Swiss-Prot record:
Entry function: Catalyzes the synthesis of GMP from XMP.
Principal EC category: ligase
InterPro entries: Class_I_gatase-like, GATASE, GMP_synth_C, GMP_synth_GATase, GMP_synthase, GMPS_ATP_PPase_dom, NAD/GMP_synthase, Rossmann-like_a/b/a_fold
Stated name of the protein: GMP synthase [glutamine-hydrolyzing]
Self-association state and partner proteins as the record states: Homodimer.
Domain GMPS ATP-PPase: 199-391
Range of residues in the leader sequence: none
């Protein structure tokens, strides 16, 4: 079997917002990589046995900061690529000079490649459109580096060591705004570092199945199945690896989208023949949420009750030794970062696969090395439906945070119908995949309307659709007026409890994507 981790790249993170993008681009080329903090121990870097090292960008100024690349990076004899801050600290640590730029540079720029024979720019034209994001610049390269690209505002746009395979770029090749950024990454990872492209879905599936079999043996495994992308892909890979040893527990909270519970059972229990236990807990959730209006309280109640019910059912399964979770690589990175984070909590995170402290189960996380886009591709390779894998994100608490204030059965049913109409029309008009997320929100206020000759005094539905790359920021989707009019008319005419539909035109920031 191919060892998909045999050729790998180590990425040292200096705090850039783009660091995860670097990793995704390296993996798109077909090479495994991992992200670690810039101050990771020297012995760890030495023993990691990377074929190459990438130094990320960062928000600090190298001349004001003690944050440097560990010296071991430059002593191992492996190729190094410094990006933005990574380039600046590499040059400075080799005797160069970095100063604050007269003018910060954020946005697209044209660089002129001075040396096309240099491996980092192989198969590229002299002029390249790139994405700059910096306030400092290299003013002196020192005796060890030479300039291999420049721009109007950044005379030192890229450098190469005269004797060693060390390269630096002031711009960000990992962003899609850099026209041939992927080519630069590929040149470094494949041509310069000599990595074989072993990281592909077929090899990942083969590797995961072997690892699961070795780890689990003949033990039984429990999985909390939510119907979301991550838990669905975990169910599929585990079923292929261990078959009947897997039992999925699907807690139907009653806060899912219209008919979603039935769809989950159809895909997994009927189509894939996976052992799924469906727990109808709708009334328990409604009872627990009665009279609760605060969104944080709702999230915590839903999360705790989910774990309690899952715990009750899991205890009934004899000889279970493992609890599977849909943890993905971005969760691992964020969890490591949050241990040192001082950021305020905007919304509590609802992890529907939480590990109850009382349960004596070992943790199984088959997706913990994969980014979300890789998880989706893995799901396709395992035969899961495209529409299940590429549907919009859905919050852990479900419609519980899309119904403002108190949650009532009538409100849930009303929102489910309205939301289903919105989604159906997005698909019909080929708009669903043009937006990143779209949903309805139930507003517990009534508004006067007229249907036919009858006065109607019913509730309001807000429609929300956004476009986003990373969901850290988002713009509201500029959907056609005719389309919005059609959706509004359908909702008001088909959902008797609604008399008015509005469209949310708030970006993030200042708003959040979800209303609660």
């Amino acid at each position: 079997m191919t060892d998909i981790h045999n050729h790998k790249i180590l990425i040292l993170d200096f705090g850039s917002q783009y660091t995860q993008l670097i990793a995704r681009r390296v993996r798109e080329v077909g090479v495994f990589c991992e992200i670690f903090p810039h101050d990771v121990a020297a012995d760890f870097i030495k023993n990691y046995q990377a074929k190459g090292i990438i130094l990320s960008g960062g928000p600090e100024s190298v001349y004001d900061s003690d944050v440097k690349a560990p010296e071991i990076v430059f002593e191992l004899g492996v190729p190094v690529l410094g990006i933005c801050y990574g380039m600046q600290t590499m040059v400075m640590q080799h005797g160069g000079e970095v100063k604050g730029a007269d003018q910060s540079e954020f946005g697209k720029a044209i660089i002129n490649i001075l040396n096309l024979t240099n491996n980092i720019f192989s198969n590229m034209e002299h002029e390249q459109l790139v994405w700059m994001s910096h306030s400092d610049k290299v003013t002196q390269t020192g005796e060890h580096f030479e300039i291999i690209a420049s721009s109007t505002n950044a005379p030192v746009a890229a450098v190469a060591h005269k004797n060693k395979p060390f390269f630096g770029v002031q711009f960000h090749p990992e962003t899609t705004h850099t026209e041939n950024g992927k080519q630069i990454i590929e040149n470094f990872v494949v041509n310069i570092c000599g990595c074989d492209t072993l990281w592909n879905i077929e090899n990942i599936i083969e590797n995961d199945i072997k690892e699961i079999k070795q780890k689990v043996g003949t033990d039984k495994v429990i999985l909390g199945l939510s119907g979301g992308v991550d838990s669905s892909v975990v169910a599929a890979i585990l079923h292929q690896a261990i078959g009947d040893q897997l039992t999925c527990i699907f807690v139907d909270t009653g806060l899912l989208r219209l008919n979603e519970g039935d769809q989950v059972m159809q895909v997994f229990a009927e189509h894939m023949d996976i052992n799924v236990i469906r727990i109808n807990a709708k009334n328990r959730f409604l009872d627990a949420l009665r009279g609760i209006c605060d969104p944080e309280q709702k999230r915590k109640i839903i999360g705790k009750l989910f774990v309690d019910i899952f715990d009750e059912e899991a205890a009934k399964i004899e000889n279970a030794k493992w609890l599977a979770q849909g943890t993905i690589y971005s969760d691992v990175i964020e969890s490591a970062g949050n241990n040192q984070s001082k950021a305020h909590v905007i919304k509590s995170h609802h992890n529907v696969g939480g590990l109850p402290k009382e349960m004596k189960l070992k943790l199984l996380e088959p997706l913990r090395e994969l980014f979300k886009d890789e998880v989706r591709k893995l799901g396709l390779g395992l035969g899961l439906p495209y529409n299940m894998l590429y549907r919009h994100p859905f919050p852990g608490p479900g419609l519980g945070v899309r119904i403002l204030g108190e949650i009532k059965k009538e409100y849930v049913e009303t929102l489910q119908k309205a939301d289903a109409i919105f989604t159906e029309e997005l698909y019909k008009h080929n708009l669903y995949h043009d937006v990143s997320q779209a949903f309805g929100v139930f507003l517990p206020i009534k508004s006067v309307g007229v249907v036919g000759d009858q006065r109607r005094y019913e509730y309001v539905i807000a429609l929300r659709a956004v476009v986003s790359i990373d969901f850290m920021t988002a713009t509201w989707a500029n959907l056609p007026y005719d389309f919005l009019s059609l959706v509004s008319n359908r909702i008001v005419n088909e959902v008797k409890q609604v008399s008015r539909v509005v469209y949310d035109v708030t970006g993030k920031p200042p708003g959040t994507i979800e209303w609660e």
